[in-house]
Amino acid sequence: MDKERNAHQIVRKDGKGCFVESLNDSFSIGRCHLAFAAYDLNRPAGERQANLVQIYLDCGELLELCRKAESGELLLRLQDKKQKGDKTPLYQCMGGTSAEKLHRIGRPRPDGKSLSRIFQLLPGNKSDFLLVADSGPGETDEKGLIVPRFGKQPENHVVISLSMGHFCELLLLTRAHYLAWLTASYSRGEEKAFHTQEPEQIPTEPQEPEMAMF
């Protein structure tokens, strides 16, 4: 899996005992794949991964984040929140995989629940941003959205601190690869850039439609 992941890697940003990497393996389903991992170097080789959260951002939302970063809007919002001591997210994405889909692909949770995933972009203290990724049990509501049911105790939790520059590199390099993929798709004469039906196999873990908050 590590070799496959490195082959798909666009960019990786490291923090203390953790990293986030952007992967190009989900453009065909309209998603930008961010993998958050935490590790413990004191563990034996091959057992060092402590937490892993897979986040799939809608490609349109990634482009909107890029627009806000390039226009200076994101910086202004960050400065305003820091001046006011506002710790609420600058951006939040809630998604996951339903219990039914997990069962269908042979990855049911032991508790039979859905898998909830949350990504948040928060104002940092010592740096510009905190990127927070959590996953744990969830429930599917009547609208088909995955509602988290882990409170303040997620099963997997990864936090990475990034400067404005490093976060923009993550965004803009991912956008560059996505736009290159779109160009290649159209140049091959593909009728549509995205699959009209959900593929049988989705990289790593499939996602239900996600709800984002800017």
Q: Predicted segments — roles?
A:
Residues 1-27, 203, 208-212:
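An N-terminus-focused feature that recognizes amino-terminal "leader" regions
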Residues 20-28, 55-59, 120-126, 159-166:
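Short, low-complexity cationic-aromatic patches
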Residues 22-45, 128-143:
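A short, structured beta-strand/loop element
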Residues 38-58, 144-159:
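A cross-kingdom feature marking solvent-exposed beta-strand/loop segments within repeated
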Residues 52-72:
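Compact, glycine/acidic-enriched structural inserts
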Residues 59, 71, 76-100:
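Negatively charged, low-complexity tracts enriched in Asp/Glu with abundant Ser/Thr
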Residues 87-157:
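Short, solvent-exposed interaction modules
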Residues 134-214:
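Mixed-charge, glycine-accented linear interaction segment located at domain edges/termini
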